[in-house]
Amino acid sequence: MNIVDLHVHSTKSDGSYTPSELVEHAIEKGLSAFALTDHDTTAGIDEAIAAAAGKPIEVIPGIEFSSEYEGRDIHIVGLYLDYKSDFFQRRLVNFVNGRIMRNQEMCRRLQEHGVAITYEELVSEFPGSVITRAHYARYLLSHGYVKSLKEAFDRYVGDNAPCFVPRKKITPMRAVEIILKAGGIPILAHPILYHMSSARLDKLVASLKEVGLIGIEAIYSTYAPSEEREIRRLAERYDLCISGGSDFHGSAKPGLDLATGYGRLFIPEEVLVNLKRKHAEMKAHPEAFRRNKILFTDLDG
């Protein structure tokens, strides 16, 4: 049976494989398709698609948006985006500008804590990448300030560390709307990782469904069988498609491999077939997927 992976990161955000290397690794692993879902950027998609040309692998254009809901970081994956559309690229510029401001302030704080770093040096060390905290951690490790990536997060850039600066984020509802307007399939990523009560998670999913959520990540690298069953029940309750992904980052997540996660992950191609069927319905009848109070009028603001 063919397998797929619908949640994968490259060097264009915080992964350690280039988009081209991901294609080769996916072929080695026997995948029929994978989605490149870098954080807040589509910069690696063209390279991945070009690398896959003429090879037995499909590269699905995707993204993973960071958003905030009731004080928690919530991620929304988008698949089959019209990522080159003017609308979508304008939205990404806003995300990039927000990250630049955050990163400049983090560099200033690191300098105050004895780290010789400038934003320009950081960007030059990771050309073409959306700078995330993983890049800071790698910089600190390679320049001898820490002995491990974990130490970098604990001492400098983790959530409770002195040099961390939170970014202003959109709501997950807004992320769903942006993905829909870009012609994509919005999916709630790894809901178990948010450590919400069942009632609170149900409330979040209901709110997202109201604005057009299509899928939910019910198959994921770290889920226990009981957790997968919980999310599958939630998907059934709200008539959502099942999605699945490893959240592969390469060396940034040691022991977690593409498609197989920590060894137990299995995402059958049927998952992608169902999502493709839903996507075809969306394109054929777009009005049916804009009936639930989706407010596109102010999305350029």
Segments the model singles out, each with a brief description of its role:
Residues M1-L31, A43-K84, L92-F95, K147, ...:
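Charged catalytic cores and adjacent phosphate/nucleic-acid-binding surfaces used
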Residues E68, E105, R109, A116-I117, ...:
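Phosphodiester-processing cores and adjacent nucleic acid-binding clamps
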Residues Q89-G98, V123-F126, P162-C163:
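Flexible, glycine/proline-enriched loop segments at strand-loop-helix junctions
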Residues N97-S124:
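Conserved phosphoryl-transfer catalytic core
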Residues F126-P191:
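Conserved acidic, metal-coordinating active-site core of Asp-based
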